[in-house]
Regions:
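Helical scaffold of the NTase/Pol beta-like nucleotidyltransferase catalytic core
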Residues: 1-26, 56-59, 254-255
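Conserved aromatic-histidine-acidic binding/catalytic patches
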Residues: 5, 50, 54, 164-168, ...
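Charged catalytic carboxylate motif
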Residues: 8-12, 61, 175, 233, ...
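Hydrophobic, Leu/Ile/Phe/Ala-enriched alpha-helical segments that form helix-helix packing faces
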Residues: 13-21, 65-73, 241, 245
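Catalytic metal-binding acidic patch
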Residues: 29, 33-64, 78-83
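Conserved NTP/Mg2+-binding pocket subregion across the NTase superfamily
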Residues: 63-166, 173, 179
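Extended, basic/helix-rich recognition subdomains
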Residues: 154-213
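Structured mid-to-C-terminal alpha-helical surface segments
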Residues: 187-255
């Protein structure tokens, strides 16, 4: 069930796209998967526009739309959207115009996102992913997950300053649990399922409890001593855990 402020933002966003007559608008992530928490979860969207609608003036109009929403709707800071066309949707490695983290950028629509769209994507407008977005082979999904753990998350563990921030604690541990489930069982899991899985993977229980409390309850500000200890405990867990996961699955998923 979508909360009132989220529903209002989505209505305004879809209304703003109306002049471009989008082929489709889809939600993935927590908003589609059933673990959405208003004000805490991101709103992860994909919009497909017709080829002849995509030009420089279109990009400017989209940036203007996001900036207006950001100024008028508090939740808009959480809204991320990548813009594809039917012709560019097939390229998993291709970068697309994206609004995320308060600004425009170009980035790919990853194999994980593509699998989410096919597995539990939510159609907000127009056509479903089938027929527009090619399915992702299991081997491609597994290879991406291993590469993401090895090339992005493992080097990040060594950057101590990052891990004093909630977002790195949350995403680092949850992404690792989700990667483990994908590689072991071939399935995508929600953040709630990832948190349930983490203690069995050896994650520190107090860190898991901290993430759970901040996501699902009303968290109190963390004391500096806990922030430092949490960072150390998370890094001490994730480094060896990622190394073990990559060692176990890296060779099997290598192209």
């Amino acid at each position: 069930m979508t909360d009132e402020a989220t529903a209002r933002l989505l209505d305004r966003f879809l209304g703003g796209l109306g002049a471009l007559d989008p082929v489709a608008v889809w939600a993935h992530g927590s908003l589609a998967g059933g673990d959405y928490r208003e004000g805490r979860s991101d709103l992860d969207l994909i919009a497909v526009l017709e080829e002849n609608a995509f030009r420089l003036s279109t990009a400017r109009a989209l940036v203007g739309l996001h900036r207006r929403l950001r100024a008028e709707e508090p939740l808009a800071r959480k809204l991320h959207c990548s813009y594809l066309t039917p012709a560019t949707a097939a390229g998993a490695g291709r970068s697309h115009l994206t609004w995320a983290h308060d600004g425009p950028m170009r980035r790919p629509v990853t194999p994980v996102t593509r699998c989410e769209l096919h597995t539990f994507g939510r159609v907000l407008h127009g056509r479903p992913p089938e027929g527009l977005l090619p399915p992702v082979p299991g081997s491609e999904l597994r290879a991406f997950v291993v590469r993401d753990q090895k090339e992005f998350w493992r080097p990040a563990v060594d950057k101590a300053r990052l891990w004093r921030q909630d977002v790195w604690i949350d995403l680092g541990t949850i992404t690792h649990a989700r990667a483990t489930a994908t590689l072991r069982e071939g399935r995508l899991i929600t953040k709630r399922e990832a948190l349930d899985l983490l203690p069995g993977l050896g994650a520190p229980q107090d860190v898991v409890d901290d993430i759970t409390r901040r996501r699902y309850e009303e968290p109190a500000p963390a004391a500096p001593a806990w922030t430092d200890r949490r960072a150390e405990r998370t890094r001490s867990y994730l480094g060896p855990a990622i190394d073990s996961l990559v060692a176990a699955y890296g060779t099997a998923t290598r192209a």
